[in-house]
Every structure is written in C-alpha cells, then in structure tokens.
C-alpha cells in the first residue's frame, strides 16, 4: 500500500541537464551544424545523450536512493518537460541507473501542484508528500497554492534544490506547530 509520494523535478533538480545557451553551442559544435531551433526545453536535442554527458546532481541523487528504497513509497519525476520528450527523459534516467515508478510530464496547462493532488485519488492512503524542485517560482505559485486543499493528517514537505543543496522550505507539519504555538501565546 502506497503511503508516501516523493516527486523530483527533472531539470536542475535530480538531473544536471544542459542550459540553453551552453547546450545550443555544444550541440552545434558536436553536430557540425547550427542548432536548428530557437527553443530549448521542448526540443529532443536538449537531452541528446550522444552529445551531452548528462549526470544527476549528487546530493539529490543520494536522496533519490534513500526514497526509492523506502517501503510504501511511490517515487515520480514531476517535470514541466512535454510528453513528447518522455523517451529522452527515460534514456537519461536509465543511463544514470535511475528508475522511478512514473514519469509525469506536462501535457496540459495543469500546474505541478494540481498534478500532485491527483495522486491523492490514485493512492488514498498517502499520508506524506515530499517534493524537490529548483524553481522558487514553482514552489511559491504551484506547490504552496495547494496546501489548503490537502487533508489535515497529511505531511507535505517542499525542498528547494540550489547549488546541489537541499533546503526544507515548507512543511505542513511546521505550519501546524507554528499555528498551535501562536494559540498558546
């Protein structure tokens, strides 16, 4: 029975994927032709394992190893990458011996927060959700906005990944303790 959901963002969180400016330059040099697109994140070239040696962020990878070995835990990749790139994402993960229960790509306008909520229907016994992301914007505008929609008995932990460090920035348990302390004062 699944009791925990752990969601890792892909780019810049679990995986140290190439950034657009550098990536386009390297891709052009290795292929011997100009990079053919103006965009980056929605293009399969951005995850071309024949061009890039794409590795995981070590601290986040260590956390992944801990989470994937924890019983009753469903580990997912929760990315803003499009569904059409799912095969490239799988290849990068497999190349790094990363195997998750699910890759959740963006295929609608739903935020990551809304996509997380859907797992409560899929696994009604979940009592803990932990998310790992490198975007403060996503944390503030997509995860924090769903806290009030979560059951009271559910622990919701948000970790910010920056410079290969994990920082717990939000926890529903911390909020409950803070509220109770305020009531006592």
What are these regions (language model features)?
Residues 74, 128, 157:
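Residues at the starts of beta-strands that form the adenosine-phosphate
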Residues 108-114, 164-169:
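A short acidic, often aromatic-flanked loop/helix-cap motif at beta-alpha or helix-coil junctions
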Residues 91-98, 117-124, 143-153:
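Short, surface-exposed basic-aromatic patches at helix termini and helix-loop junctions that form
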Residues 136-185:
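Asp-based, Mg2+/Mn2+-dependent phosphohydrolase catalytic module
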Residues 13-14, 83, 135-137, 165:
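Solvent-exposed loop/turn segments at secondary-structure junctions
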Residues 2-110:
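Alpha-helical substrate-recognition element adjacent to the catalytic core
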Residues 4, 112-142:
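Conserved Lys-Pro-Asp/Glu-containing loop-to-beta segment of HAD-superfamily phosphomonoesterases
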């Amino acid at each position: 029975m699944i009791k925990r959901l752990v969601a890792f963002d892909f780019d810049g969180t679990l995986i140290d994927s190439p950034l657009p400016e550098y990536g386009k330059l390297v891709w052009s040099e290795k292929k011997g032709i100009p990079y053919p697109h103006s965009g980056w994140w929605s293009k399969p070239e951005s995850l071309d394992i024949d061009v890039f040696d794409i590795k995981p962020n070590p601290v986040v990878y260590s956390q992944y190893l801990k989470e994937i070995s924890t019983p009753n835990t469903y580990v997912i990749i929760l990315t803003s990458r499009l569904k059409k790139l799912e095969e490239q994402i799988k290849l990068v993960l497999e190349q790094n011996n990363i195997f998750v229960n699910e890759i959740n790509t963006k295929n609608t306008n739903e935020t990551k927060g809304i996509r997380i909520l859907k797992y409560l229907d899929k696994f009604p016994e979940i009592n803990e959700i932990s998310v790992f992301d490198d975007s403060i914007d996503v944390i503030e505008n997509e995860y924090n906005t769903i806290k009030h929609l979560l059951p009271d008995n559910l622990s919701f932990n948000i970790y910010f990944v920056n410079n290969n460090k994990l920082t717990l920035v939000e926890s529903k348990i911390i909020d409950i303790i803070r509220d109770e302390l305020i009531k006592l004062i």
